[in-house]
């Protein structure tokens, strides 16, 4: 499983994809910002290795 799950929370909770590194997360965020003319709120949730689930309650906003 990938380390991060990436979402756009601007209008709902759209999953953008999964990434292993923060560089990949930032690339997804840049692509989403370009596709939506900046009307997005991209966040990422880190994988909890103990449960195999993503910690959405502890998500981090991705700064572009």
Located regions from the model:
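Short aromatic-glycine-(Arg/Gly/Cys) micro-motifs in beta-strand/loop hairpins
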Residues: 1-15
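Short, mixed-charge low-complexity intrinsically disordered segments
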Residues: 31-64
């Amino acid at each position: 499983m990938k380390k991060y799950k990436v979402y756009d929370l601007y209008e709902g909770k759209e999953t953008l994809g999964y990434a292993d590194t923060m560089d990949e997360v930032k690339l997804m965020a840049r692509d989403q910002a370009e596709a939506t003319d900046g009307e997005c709120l991209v966040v990422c949730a880190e994988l909890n290795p103990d449960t195999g689930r993503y910690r959405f309650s502890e998500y981090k906003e991705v700064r572009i």
